[in-house]
Swiss-Prot record:
PROSITE patterns the record matches: FN3 (PS50853), HEMATOPO_REC_L_F2 (PS01353)
Keyword ATP-binding: no
Motif (WSXWS motif): 519-523
Entry protein name: Leukemia inhibitory factor receptor
Length: 1097
């Protein structure tokens, strides 16, 4: 590169103040100079000056610099290149490039000019290492090969490290191309280091596609990474591509063939054929086709699974043919597990191991094992068997003489990989002897034998530890360890002592080394019977007197095997008194009882057992026992399988204690078994196979002093208490109206099955077949329960019962073992006569008292009751006030018919005077003009009868005041004439002033004889308001009845009230009194007549 520079400096005279006046002139001169210089440079270039200097390096030693020649330069032009400040700094070249040694860091000035060409300018350049590019030479591939069985490409090239001045890091980039279109399938980098000399590098790559399937090409380039070089660093050019050469086989079309791959891998299969492939499948699965060059196709399988032992088929189908291969998918060998090496006989080492995870590969692809020993350098190969025992393999390695330490390495290998496991052992500490054989037993004496056996192996250099197992019947096994020196002939002998005479023993043997690694397996059992000896003890003896007290029965127990020391043949029983001994005949072995007829003297009884060797020591017992007056019977309960008896320590007991027991329900003599306990004991557990739950047993504790036994305690008890099996039998002794007396009997001991704790008595009301006491323990309130814990009580009186009532009674006994069954009955209490009498008298007395009180009250209030509920009702037949004159009903046009109106009940009050006014029965209706006797108003109010009456609903009518003034001796006053439409009653003042409001039903009214105009007008005014009018126009009446009354003055116009005429039928409502008709006697009885007073009838 050429740099053109121009340096301008101010002259000193331009600095002072005088120079400022020259500034403008100097600037013009400077610009003129620059312009001339630039024109000269342009003219020079046009004439052929070199330009664009560039330098590169391939090895950091030499820089290759080049420039562009001018267009005017011709052939044969020679350039001179000079570098300042360097010796031999000028170089000549006929080309436009030259190589110069690498320059030091910094700027360097380089000039280039053409020689022999006058007038040409010189080109100057500034060159720095930063402007130099480091571009390595293009690498060269020395060799490219392929392993088609594994689809692996092997690349080899030279790094040319000798051209570099020092150690550098070189980065290689390798590309793999596939198929005819040069598709890049892999681009990787590979780092190496050059150190000043040429080195050949190797690199391998495994293709995911078989190399036979398509063309594979490889190219390489490099990049030098020198940290000290400050210039630009660039990649070299790619090397020429090299291809993998493969010659097609006419037989094989599918690749890879018989491939073994790892489970879970991805694999590609291809079919190389000129035919068109229609489909492809692996196993039973169809796969999509991948098209390659020509008609070649491929399929890719992802995450392939384990194949069968025979492999998995891969098939390509064309129109005419089927091509295929087999693939085997499995695992690499697992690390051998549980590797163990030991010896049985110190002659041969056996190593065993577990292969671990199955590889799923069989046949030639199966795992092979090799056992290598590093100290000796020997190895053995595993010979495969079809079915290894217990999934464990083993190899045998012959021991080397005088070698005890072995270092084994077990190698495992199959087509998918390899693994190994190592073990270091001292073989003398890893001895696992074989099973001892040929066991023999010989007698030494009755308590010792000699054992011999055979143990294969050469154990002369070590000691053996053997264990002897000794078993005998009904005894805990015994293990004895013995240490013996190993021998070469494998025969061993050991004495076993401390045995029991006449005892069957079973012997077994196993062995190991003294350092112990493993016991051998147990040998076969060897049974042996030791010889007999004299019995070591006399029989266990007891005596009982017969029930009549005349004979003494001697009992003894058979000697146990460890005391009999042989087969007992017979027993000898003798008795002595005052040093006189009487011996009985020998008693054969099966019999263990003898009966002696003795008096009440204290004899010493001796019993001796005999076997084939001799007699046992005698067992002695006194015939009489020491009496004990202070003896109480106690109770005890066992623990399920036995019963615990305790007592206080007694130093006077010199020999031992004897506990005997029997079933309490059996007859005398009571003896089931006995047990002797040392004299220093204070308790004993009595156990027997004959004990049964719920059975009462008697236990007797005897203490021995001065060769005599004394009964110390008498105990009855149960091994386990149960509930009674029967209910107590009870009866009713007496019944009354309020109580029941029951009585029951004891339950037999055999059926009680425990200690009786009490009775539960239940009772409730209930009839037979209807009352069932359920859930007696549930606490029902209607069931009464009595718990009887006094066992001496045999009767119970149930009080506070109801008479003539049925009761359900239930009785149950209970023990600590549970509740027994129930016994029930129904009882009816007697009738309570006193209660019945009281029940009758109380209601009668109450009724009498209520009647008397009611009578007194009614008598005192009789008038009020009569007036209130039953007032006197006048007899219409005896009423003369209603008899009118005939003229009243004849031809009087003023009379009018009555009108029917709704009727509501009303009350009619009839006032009677006691003296002045005649009785209503004898009074006749008189004319209004007749003179009426005076009557007192007080008398009118004193005595009146209220009669129920039902008039029609009427309009009220004010009575004529004149009528009141002309009142006669008798009058009828109508009160409380109520209408359903009538307003509430008004005060008397309002009624007197209101003529309409006081009108009601008034059949009789007193009117004046001569009617005035005012009266008529008032009457007309009251027509609408007046109520019931029994008299209308008299002249219009049609008298049908011959007995109808008529007015004597038919011409006089009067208004009649209380008409006897019917409204509709115009019949007289109240017929006149007929003298001829029979009188009503009023003899008919009614409840109302009971309260009425009729003195005049």
């Amino acid at each position: 590169m050429m740099n053109i520079s121009l340096r301008l400096r101010r002259p000193p005279w331009m600095v002072d103040s005088n120079g400022r006046r020259m500034t403008s002139h100097f600037q013009w001169l400077l610009l003129t100079f620059i312009l001339l210089y630039l024109m000269n440079q342009v003219t020079s270039e046009k004439r052929g000056a070199p330009r664009d200097l560039k330098c590169i390096t391939n090895n950091l030693r030499v820089w290759d610099c080049s420039w562009k020649a001018p267009s005017a330069a011709g052939h044969g032009t020679v350039y001179e290149i000079c570098i300042e400040n360097r010796s031999h700094s000028c170089y000549q070249s006929e080309k436009t490039n030259t190589k110069i040694p690498a320059l030091l860091p910094g700027d360097h000035e380089i000039t280039i000019n053409r020689l022999y060409d006058f007038g040409n300018p010189i080109s100057k350049f500034t060159l720095n290492e930063k402007n130099v590019s480091l571009i390595p030479d293009t690498p060269e591939i020395l060799n490219l090969s392929a392993d088609f069985s594994t689809s692996t490409i092997h690349l080899k090239w030279n790094d040319r490290g000798s051209v570099f001045p020092h150690q550098l890091t070189v980065i290689w980039e390798i590309k793999i191309l596939r198929k005819e279109n040069m598709e890049i399938v892999k681009l990787i980098t590979h780092n190496t280091t050059v150190n000043g000399k040429d080195t050949v590098h190797h690199w391998s790559w495994t293709s995911d596609m078989p190399l036979e399937c398509a063309i594979h090409s490889v190219g390489i380039r490099c990049y030098v990474d020198d940290p000290h070089f400050s210039g630009r660093k660039e990649w070299s050019d790619w090397s020429p591509l090299k291809n993998i050469s493969w010659s097609p086989d006419s037989q094989t079309k599918v690749f890879p063939q018989d491939k073994v791959i790892l489970v879970g891998s991805d694999i590609t299969f291809c079919c190389v054929t000129q035919e068109k492939v229609l489909s492809a499948q692996i196993g039973q699965t169809n796969c999509p086709l991948i098209h390659l060059d020509g008609e070649n196709v491929a399929i890719k399988i992802h995450n392939i699974s384990v194949s069968a032992n025979s492999g998995t088929n891969v098939v390509f189908t064309t129109e005419d043919n089927i091509f295929g291969t087999v693939i085997f998918v499995g695992y690499p060998p697992d690390i051998p597990q549980k590797v163990n090496c030991e010896t049985y006989d110190l002659k041969e080492i056996v190593c065993t191991w577990n292969p671990g995870r199955p590889t799923a590969l069989v046949g030639p692809r199966n795992t092979s094992y090799t056992l290598f020993e590093s100290f000796s350098g020997k190895y053995v190969r595993f010979k495969r068997v079809e079915a290894p025992t217990n999934e464990s393999y083993q190899l045998f390695f012959q021991m080397r003489p005088n070698q005890e330490i072995y270092n084994f390495t077990l190698n495992a290998r199959n087509p998918l990989g390899r693994s190994e496991s190592t073990i270091l052992i001292n073989i003398t500490e890893k001895v696992y002897p074989r099973i001892p054989t040929s066991i023999k037993v010989k007698d030494i004496n009755s308590t010792a034998v000699m054992l011999s056996w055979h143990l294969p192996g050469n154990f002369a250099k070590i000691k053996l530890l053997c264990q002897i197992e000794i078993n005998k019947t009904n005894s805990v096994q015994e293990l004895r360890n013995v240490t013996i020196k190993g021998v070469e002939n494998s025969s061993y002998l050991v004495a076993v002592d401390k045995l029991n005479p006449y005892t069957i023993y079973t012997f077994r043997i196993r062995c190991s080394t003294e350092t112990f690694w493993k016991w051998s397996k147990w040998s076969n059992e060897k049974k042996y019977l030791t010889t007999e000896a004299i019995p070591s003890k006399g029989p266990d003896t007891w005596r009982e007197w017969s029930s009549d007290g005349k004979n003494l029965i001697i009992y003894w127990k058979p000697l146990p095997i460890n005391e009999a020391n042989g087969k007992i043949l017979s027993y000898n029983v003798s008795c002595s008194l005052d040093e006189e001994t009487q011996s009985l005949s020998e008693i054969p072995d099966p019999q263990h009882k003898a009966e002696l007829q003795l008096d009440k003297n204290d004899y010493i009884i001796s019993v001796v057992a005999k076997n084939s060797v001799g007699s046992s020591p005698p067992s002695k017992i006194a015939s009489m026992e020491i009496p004990n007056d202070d003896l109480k019977v106690e109770q005890a309960v066992g623990m399920g399988n036995g019963i615990l008896l305790t007592w206080n320590y007694d130093p006077n007991m010199t020999c031992d204690y004897v506990i005997k027991w029997c079933n309490s329900s059996r007859s005398e003599p009571c003896l089931m078994d006995w047990k002797k306990v040392p004299s220093n004991s204070t308790e004993a557990v009595i156990e027997s196979d004959q004990f049964r739950p719920g059975v009462r047993y008697s236990f007797f504790l005897y203490g021995c002093r001065n060769e005599g036994y004394q009964l110390l305690r008498s105990i009855i008890g149960y091994i386990e208490e149960l509930a009674p099996i029967v209910a107590p039998n009870f009866t009713v002794e007496d019944t009354s109206a309020d109580s029941i007396l029951v009585k029951w009997e004891d339950i037999p001991v055999e059926e009680l099955r425990g200690f009786l704790r009490g009775y539960l008595f239940y009772f409730e009301k209930g009839e037979r077949d209807t009352s069932k006491i359920r859930g007696l323990e549930s606490g029902r309130s209607d069931i009464k329960v009595k718990n009887i814990t006094d066992l001496s009580q045999k009767t119970l009186r149930i009080a506070d019962l109801q008479g003539k009532t049925s009761y359900h009674l239930v009785l149950r006994a209970y023990t600590d073992g549970g509740m027994g069954p129930e016994k029930s009955m129904f009882v009816v209490t007697k009738e309570n006569s006193v209660g019945l009498i009281i029940a009758i008298l109380i209601p009668v007395a109450v009724a009498v008292i209520v009647g008397v009180v009611t009578s007194i009250l009614c008598y005192r209030k009789r008038e009020w009751i009569k007036e209130t509920f039953y007032p006197d009702i006048p007899n219409p037949e005896n009423c003369k006030a209603l008899q009118f004159q005939k003229s009243v009903c004849e031809g009087n046009s003023a009379l009018k018919t009555l009108e029917m109106n709704p009727c509501t009940p009303n009350n009619v009050e009839v006032l009677e005077t006691r003296s002045a006014v005649p009785k209503i029965e004898d009074t006749e209706i008189i004319s209004p003009i007749a003179e009426r006797p005076e009557e007192s108003s007080d008398a009118e109010a004193e005595n009146h009868v209220v009669v129920s009456y039902c008039p029609p609903v009427i309009e009220e009518e004010t009575p004529n005041p004149g009528a009141d003034e002309a009142g006669g001796a008798s009058q009828v006053v109508y009160i409380d004439i109520q209408s359903m439409y009538q307003p509430q009653a008004k005060p008397e003042e309002e009624q007197e002033n209101d003529p309409v409001g006081g009108a009601g039903y008034k059949p009789q009214m007193h009117l004046p004889v001569t009617s005035t105009v005012e009266d008529l007008a008032a009457e007309d005014d009251l027509d609408k308001a007046a109520g019931y009018r029994p008299q209308a126009n008299v002249n219009t009446w049609n008298l049908v009845s011959p007995d109808s009354p008529r007015s004597t003055d038919s011409n006089s116009e009067i208004v009649s009230f209380g008409s006897p005429c019917s409204i509709n039928s115009r019949q007289f409502l109240i017929p006149p009194k007929d003298e001829d008709s029979p009188k009503s006697s009023g003899g008919g009885w009614s409840f109302t007549n009971f309260f009425q007073n009729k003195p005049n009838d």
